[in-house]
Amino acid sequence: MAEKQRGPNRLAKVSLDEASIARGNPDQEHERAIALFDILEDNSFTIPGREGPYALTLGLVENKLSFAIATVDGEPVMTHLLSLTPFRRVIRDYEMICESYYNAIRTASPSQIEAIDMGRRGLHNEASETLKQRLEGKVDLDHDTARRLFTLIFALHWKG
């Protein structure tokens, strides 16, 4: 679990439900650690009508994405379940392009790596916009926070 304290409308703690994740390869574990660090360094996360800061546990429950939100003291605020259906295609495509990216780093030219990375960022942006739309009215978050959350959502799908 990662933890950090700052202003009220933010995530101060973020974790992935241990029952929902498999251990990834070293690249994946590194990406997961970076995503947890980055989201705590800078995020905007607000539940309308409820002041934070918040603690978030992401998980998978019956093939749905679970956002278990609590106060930093552990008092439950809400649990929101999202269908994974709108994310399935982008998760599949993102997984393929990440694999291509990691392979390209070892063998491709800088211009080829850059082209793959542009595609990866485009898919990441698409997924973060979908996430913002799916949470609209329940959780307000900025683009960068949505991107970082998608990285963690993607981490829930890594095969061990």
UniProtKB/Swiss-Prot annotation:
Superkingdom assignment: Bacteria
InterPro entries xrefs: UCP032146
Disulfide bridge partners, by residue number: none
Pfam families to which the protein is assigned, alphabetical: UPF0262
Family, per entry: Belongs to the UPF0262 family.
Identification of the protein by name: UPF0262 protein Mrad2831_3513
Species whose genome carries this gene: Methylobacterium radiotolerans (strain ATCC 27329 / DSM 1819 / JCM 2831 / NBRC 15690 / NCIMB 10815 / 0-1)
Native organism taxonomy: Bacteria, Pseudomonadati, Pseudomonadota, Alphaproteobacteria, Hyphomicrobiales
